[in-house]
Amino acid sequence: TREKVESYVAGQATHHLAEDSAMRALFSDLAVVNPDINLSTARFTAHARYWANLHVVFVHNWRQAITDPEIWIGIRNMLRRASQSKVHLLSRAGFVPDHLHFTLGIHPGESPLDVGLSYMNNLAWVHNLEPIFMPSFYVATFGEYDLGAIHPATGPAPVV
């Protein structure tokens, strides 16, 4: 569900970095948690009510760790600017030295592939257009719904 995805994204530094590390403190401070954006709220077009949310993950080439705070500040700022210019709702972003996660509300007519590629291209500007990310990325939709495919007490539903 949305709450689980957003919590996971916001907690990347806690999940991946040692508790007493300076890197954990840095990446925790860099995380984006935007309380003004609520991806559980329906958005509207002229003909429909919708929830179109994406969880996107970009991994650095060969998981190369980037620890320069200025680069990560640039990435965070570019994510914010890109989401504003695309009229996307950036609710969370979590960073660790070798990858980043973020959650967005998008328009239902947009392709998740096109959205991911557009952010990958925007973020390349922070790295002087160097190809710093793996040539693929993870993208998934999420929302408030739960199809009940996995019941918490009984596990996966039987296949019939």
Residue spans for each PLM region:
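Charge-rich, low-complexity N-terminal segments
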Residues: 1-160
